[in-house]
UniProtKB/Swiss-Prot annotation:
Annotated gene: tal
Protein name: Probable transaldolase
Main subcellular location of this protein, as a coarse class: cytoplasm
A Gene Ontology BP annotation from the UniProt entry: carbohydrate metabolic process
Keywords assigned by UniProt, alphabetized: Cytoplasm, Pentose shunt, Schiff base, Transferase
Subcellular location: Cytoplasm
The protein's annotated pathway: Carbohydrate degradation; pentose phosphate pathway; D-glyceraldehyde 3-phosphate and beta-D-fructose 6-phosphate from D-ribose 5-phosphate and D-xylulose 5-phosphate (non-oxidative stage): step 2/3
PROSITE patterns: TRANSALDOLASE_1
Gene3D superfamilies (alphabetical): Aldolase class I (3.20.20.70)
Family: Belongs to the transaldolase family. Type 3B subfamily.
Role, per record: Transaldolase is important for the balance of metabolites in the pentose-phosphate pathway.
Enzyme nomenclature, EC number: 2.2.1.2
Enzyme class: transferase
Length: 216
């Protein structure tokens, strides 16, 4: 499973990238707005930190303007992945962009049939929102399982990018189902490294080693 960071915070991206375990980054207009910086500048800086895909989202809702915005975004760096909403115009834009060799992340997916349409449009990634799905009384992980089954049935190349990840259980369940990618806030990713028994084990080893009076 690939790990993407869902953030526009440069320091957090640098910290995660330094582990060698970060495969990409996803951003959206809300995350960019929080940074208080120019979106091109932020996107360019992120693209220089990570080698993998960096999702940058269009804000237009019509196909023609989406294409104009996508043209601006993809000139920022070679690893920019254009993010479009799962709408008719969004999928029309996806079809055109992927046909030209541009990576596209189709976002705001809330049903398996939407994901099917995204795959037919040639999406590089489809982003089902599991946390938000759960918030509205649905089963986010069942959505991921349904998409996985459909994609396997038809051998679609579109990667399932699990979004709106709230905690480690989401990551675990998505991995068990076979999702290709998960994107999560830095705090969630950093939490995956931790376990109380790991910490206790380290404390015990260090205490025992200190008693020997040795050094390495």
């Amino acid at each position: 499973m690939k790990f993407f960071a869902d953030t526009a915070e440069i320091d957090a991206i640098q910290e995660l990238a330094a582990t060698g375990l970060l495969d990409g980054v996803t951003t959206n207009p809300s995350l960019i707005a929080k940074s208080g910086r120019d979106f091109k500048e932020v996107t360019r800086e992120i693209c220089a930190i990570v080698d993998g895909p960096v999702s940058a989202e269009v804000v237009a809702l019509d196909h023609e303007t989406m294409m104009k915005e996508a043209e601006i975004l993809r000139k920022i760096a070679d690893n920019v992945c254009i993010k479009v909403p799962l709408t008719i115009d969004g999928l029309k834009t996806c079809k055109k962009l992927t046909g030209d060799g541009t990576m596209v992340n189709v976002t705001l997916c809330f049903s398996a049939t939407q994901a099917l349409l995204a795959a037919k449009a040639g999406a590089t990634f489809v982003s089902p929102f599991v946390g938000r799905h759960d918030d509205n009384g649905f089963d986010g992980m069942q959505l991921i399982a349904d998409i996985r089954l459909i994609y396997d049935n038809y051998d679609f190349g579109t990667e399932i990018l699990v979004a709106s990840v709230r905690h480690g259980i989401h990551v675990l369940e998505a991995a068990k189902i076979g999702a290709d990618v998960m994107t999560a806030p830095p705090a969630v990713i950093k939490g995956l490294f931790k376990h109380v028994l790991t910490e206790k084990g380290i404390e015990g080893f260090l205490a025992d080693w200190a008693k020997t009076g040795q050094s390495i």
